[in-house]
C-alpha cells in the first residue's frame, strides 16, 4: 500500500479534481517540476526543501510529523559521563563551555555530509565562531579539513561499510573509545542501550548512565510539502492544504464493533462516518503510514519549518552548490 497513487486518489476525492502523480528521479527533479509548473506540490527532504526555498523561490505549506508527533529531529553531541566535557556541561557554571572543550578531541560522525551527524553540528560550530573558515577553499570538500582542524585528525568520518557508520555507529565509536564526542540522534542511546530486555541492547553498550547528551544544535526538519507560489494561487493552495490536513481525521477500522453494528472501513472522526466502499490504501491513516511515513501532517511555513535548519547549514562552505549537484 505504499503506492503514491493512493495519495493522488485521496486528494482527487477531497478536491473534486483529477490529481495525478508526476514521476521524477531525483530531488532536483522535484524542484525543476515545481519551477516549471509541471507539478504543483512535492514531498521533499530537508536538504532539498531548503535548496528549493533559498535558491529557487519555492515555499513550504505543510510538514509530515515524525513518530514522536513533532516536525523536528534534534542532533545531539554525546559524551562519556566521566569526561571533562560532560562535567563542564553539567556544572551550571556559565564560564565553562563544553563546546569549546571539544577542540582537539577525536569526534565520531554518522557519515560524510550527513545532516544530523555532520552538517548541523559543524554549521553551529562555524556560525558561533568555534571554527574559523578563513583560508578554506570554500567548497564542500574543505569541510573535512575544518573537522580535522577543530577536532582531531583521528576523527571518524565513516563510509557505508564501516561499523561506525550511521546514528548507531557513531555511538559505538564513542563507546569503544575511538572518539570522545559522538554526533548522533536524540533517542539513539535509549533505543540501543536501555531496552526493557537487556539482551536487546547492543553488546558494545556502556551503562546507560555513562552517556551524557549535549543539546545545543538546530533541528533537522521532517519531510516538507513544497509548492511554487508563482504557479499555485492562494485559493488552490488553501484547498490542497485543507485536503492534506484532513488525512489526520481518517482511521481505518477492521471488524470494529459498536452499539450500532460491526464495521470495516475508513472512519472519518470529524463526521463520525465509516466509508466501507473506498480502498483501504486510500484511507488517511493508511496514506500517512505507508506513503508519508508519519502519524500526521500539519500546516507549516518555510521560515518556521526550515528556518532553524537554514540558520546552521548556511555556514557550511559550498553547501548550496553541493545540494544543487547531489540532491
Predicted regions and their residues:
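A ligand-binding cleft/hinge motif common to bilobed small-molecule-binding domains
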Residues: 43-57, 127, 167-208
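Short helix-initiation/N-cap motifs at beta->coil->alpha
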Residues: 22-32, 133-172, 176, 187
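Stable alpha-helical elements in mature extracytoplasmic
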Residues: 3, 7, 30, 45-48, ...
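Second-shell loop/turn segments in exported
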Residues: 39, 106-114, 159-160, 227-229, ...
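Extracytoplasmic small-molecule ligand-binding "clamshell" domains
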Residues: 1-50
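A conserved helix-loop-strand patch within extracytoplasmic ligand-binding domains
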Residues: 62-135
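Extended ligand-binding regions for polar small-molecule ligands
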Residues: 8-14, 74, 78-93, 197-294, ...
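Solvent-exposed loop/turn segments at secondary-structure junctions
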Residues: 48-50, 67-68, 83-85, 112-116, ...
Amino acid at each position: 500500500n505504499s503506492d503514491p497513487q493512493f495519495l493522488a486518489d485521496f486528494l482527487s476525492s477531497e478536491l473534486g479534481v483529477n490529481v495525478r502523480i508526476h514521476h521524477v528521479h531525483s530531488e532536483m527533479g522535484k524542484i525543476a517540476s515545481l519551477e516549471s509548473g509541471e507539478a504543483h506540490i512535492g514531498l521533499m527532504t530537508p536538504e532539498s526543501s531548503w535548496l528549493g526555498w533559498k535558491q529557487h523561490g519555492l515555499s513550504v505549506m505543510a510538514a509530515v510529523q515524525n513518530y514522536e508527533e513533532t516536525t523536528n529531529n534534534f542532533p545531539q553531541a554525546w559524551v562519556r559521563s566521566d569526561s571533562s566535557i560532560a562535567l563542564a556541561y553539567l556544572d551550571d557554571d556559565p564560564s565553562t563551555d563544553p563546546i569549546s572543550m571539544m577542540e582537539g578531541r577525536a569526534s565520531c560522525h554518522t557519515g560524510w555530509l550527513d545532516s544530523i551527524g555532520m552538517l548541523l553540528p559543524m554549521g553551529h560550530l562555524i556560525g558561533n565562531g568555534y571554527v574559523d573558515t578563513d583560508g578554506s577553499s570554500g567548497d564542500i570538500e574543505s569541510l573535512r579539513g575544518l573537522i580535522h582542524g577543530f577536532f582531531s585528525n583521528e576523527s571518524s568520518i565513516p563510509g557505508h561499510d564501516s561499523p561506525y557508520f550511521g546514528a548507531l555507529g557513531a555511538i559505538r565509536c564513542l563507546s569503544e573509545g575511538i572518539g570522545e564526542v559522538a554526533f548522533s540522534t536524540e533517542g539513539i542511546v535509549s533505543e540501543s542501550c536501555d531496552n526493557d530486555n537487556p539482551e536487546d541492547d547492543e553488546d558494545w553498550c556502556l551503562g546507560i548512565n555513562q552517556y551524557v547528551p549535549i543539546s545545543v544544535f538546530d533541528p533537522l526538519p521532517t519531510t516538507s510539502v513544497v509548492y511554487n507560489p508563482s504557479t499555485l494561487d492562494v485559493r488552490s493552495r488553501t484547498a490542497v492544504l485543507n485536503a492534506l490536513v484532513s488525512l489526520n481525521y481518517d482511521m481505518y477500522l477492521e471488524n470494529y464493533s459498536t452499539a450500532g453494528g460491526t464495521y470495516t472501513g475508513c472512519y472519518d472522526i470529524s463526521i463520525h462516518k465509516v466509508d466501507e466502499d473506498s480502498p483501504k490504501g486510500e484511507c488517511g491513516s493508511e496514506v500517512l503510514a505507508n506513503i508519508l511515513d508519519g502519524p500526521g501532517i500539519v500546516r507549516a511555513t518555510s521560515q518556521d519549518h526550515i528556518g532553524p535548519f537554514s540558520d546552521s547549514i548556511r555556514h557550511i562552505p559550498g553547501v548550496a552548490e553541493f545540494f544543487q549537484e547531489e540532491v
